Amino acid sequence: MVLQQSDLLILGVVIGTHGLRGDLKIRGSDQDFPLLSKMHQLVFLREGETVLKCARRKAGWYKGHLLLQIAGYRDVRAVQHLVGCEVAVRRDDVPGLPAGEYYWFQLKGMTAVDRRLGALGCLEDIFTTAAHDIYVINGDYGEVLVPAVKAFIADVDLESNRILFDLPDGLVQET
């Protein structure tokens, strides 16, 4: 079976090796690492072309980066060619979440709507703080930062690609 780019979810980039045993140093976002460290089957891509499909042997953290060790590769020279590759997983392999929980990739790109203000724009990014995630929405109101808390999220509709908010007064600067 040939994998299409749309079948894959890119979770990071190999930025180097670590040690002599073939560990790969991965750069990605805070939202990517927990999922990437759980996935067993990985796909390495360079310029959209598959370089290697393999199983994850081990994953761990080191100085803000994820270290991956892949099955069958125990030497730094054997994995050197993967530096610069994107690390992806098949979307179908991503485990489901309990009702009401979503992966970042399901939310990014959604149309953000507030019950009172109407369309806010597009949910373009998500970042993590000590307290909770923050949704970055860009649109007619400029950049709006919305705390990802249940009190503000009225509904998430994956089928219509829309997230409905019930934002408090003052969170969005109205002109």
Swiss-Prot record:
MF (Gene Ontology): ribosome binding
Entry keyword annotation includes Lipoprotein: no
Alphabetical list of HAMAP family matching this protein: Ribosome_mat_RimM (MF_00014)
The record's note on its domains: The PRC barrel domain binds ribosomal protein uS19.
Transmembrane annotation, as ranges: none
Protein name: Ribosome maturation factor RimM
Coiled coil (residue ranges): none
Keywords on record: Chaperone, Cytoplasm, Ribosome biogenesis, rRNA processing
Gene name linked to the record: rimM
Signal peptide limits: none
NCBIfam families linked to this entry: 16S_RimM (TIGR02273)
Quaternary structure and interacting proteins, as annotated: Binds ribosomal protein uS19.
SUPFAM superfamilies: PRC-barrel domain (SSF50346), Translation proteins (SSF50447)
Similarity comment text for this entry: Belongs to the RimM family.
Function: An accessory protein needed during the final step in the assembly of 30S ribosomal subunit, possibly for assembly of the head region. Essential for efficient processing of 16S rRNA. May be needed both before and after RbfA during the maturation of 16S rRNA. It has affinity for free ribosomal 30S subunits but not for 70S ribosomes.
GO biological process, one term: ribosomal small subunit biogenesis
Superkingdom, natural source: Bacteria
Record organism: Syntrophotalea carbinolica (strain DSM 2380 / NBRC 103641 / GraBd1) (Pelobacter carbinolicus)
Any single GO CC term annotated in Swiss-Prot or TrEMBL for this entry: ribosome
Pfam family of the protein (one): RimM
Cellular localization per UniProt: Cytoplasm
Domain PRC barrel residues, every copy: 99-171
